Design a protein with these regions (language model features):
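Catalytic-core segments of class I nucleotidyltransferases/pyrophosphorylases
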Residues: 101-110, 116-120, 125-134, 139-142, ...
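Short, well-ordered beta-strand micro-motif
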Residues: 27, 183, 223-225
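A generic "binding-loop/recognition-motif" signal
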Residues: 10, 21, 56, 80, ...
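Short beta-strand-to-loop element that shapes/binds the nucleotide-sugar donor at the catalytic cleft/hinge
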Residues: 169-187
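Conserved catalytic-core motifs of eukaryotic protein kinase domains, centered on the activation segment
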Residues: 16-19
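Conserved N-terminal catalytic core of the sugar/cofactor nucleotidyltransferase
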Residues: 2-5, 13, 27, 31-145, ...
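Conserved beta-strand segments of alpha/beta enzyme cores
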Residues: 24, 73-75, 168, 189
């Protein structure tokens, strides 16, 4: 399984701690936040991790080297030239996360070839299409902000996403109090965002009305898919803003 840790941010809300180090290396309970997340991912069965870096990137690279990458395959997405936020950062990491060969069956077929071949044999149409789509759904990635520590069961989150039909991204949210909420409809589909301090809303033109949506705080953890990666434009933007634009 594959994951990406967003560790490039400036950590402005953690100043003055981040004046001399990246937020990924802030220590909590005797371990850096980055170490907590890497070890939790490793324990959950993840064997490939991409980490994006920008602020004090040399410190993160040295930390990983000193710890032999904690015995896991870790690749670095370098944003030292320009901080890209979560959406742009994910797009830059595209080729580190997405390997087309992972979309093949054990027999070397793509999901599309499998669907076509078995339909030609006269097999049940719904069953074959579901098998092909199942292969595509299994190729997904867990995305995790580096400044989030949680008791989330990563295996259960991945299982939920992989066994949910027609879902391109699964966001981990909570009912905690905040000024900024994600807005969902009754089917738990993302429909908007609101800052209750300023009453700014997204997407443009959204009219917010109290009680019209289910309101949750984003927890900084999600699962996404190759389909989303293929749609991402280059540039600097939030992944949540991107979801609200499509």
């Amino acid at each position: 399984m594959k994951a990406m840790i967003f560790a490039a941010g400036l950590g402005s809300r953690l100043k003055p701690l981040t004046d001399t180090r990246p937020k990924a290396l802030i220590t909590v309970g005797g371990k850096t936040m980055l170490e907590h997340i890497i070890l939790k991912l490793k324990a959950a069965g993840f064997d490939e991790i991409v980490i994006n870096v920008h602020h004090f990137s040399n410190q993160i690279l040295a930390f990983l080297e000193a710890n032999q990458n904690f015995g896991i395959d870790i690749q670095i997405s370098d944003e030292t030239d320009c901080l890209l936020d979560t959406g742009g950062g994910l797009e830059r990491a595209y080729y580190l996360l997405h390997h087309p060969e992972d979309m093949f069956t054990k027999e070397g077929e793509t999901p599309y070839e499998l669907i076509f071949e078995n339909l030609m044999k006269g097999m049940d149409e719904e069953e074959i299409i579901e098998r092909g789509l199942g292969i595509m759904r299994k190729e997904c990635y867990l995305l995790h902000n580096v400044d989030i520590l949680s008791n989330c069961d990563f295996e259960s989150l991945m299982y939920y996403h992989q066994n949910s039909s027609n879902i391109n991204a699964t966001l981990l949210v909570s009912p905690r109090k905040t000024s900024r909420y994600l807005l969902f409809n009754d089917d738990n589909l993302l429909r908007g965002w609101v800052n209750k301090d300023t009453m700014e809303t997204k997407p443009a033109g959204l009219r917010y009305k109290e009680g019209e949506y289910r309101e949750y705080a984003y927890s900084g953890i999600q699962v996404t898919t190759p389909k989303i990666l293929n749609l991402l434009p280059r540039g600097k933007y939030s992944i949540i803003d991107f979801y609200l634009s499509i």
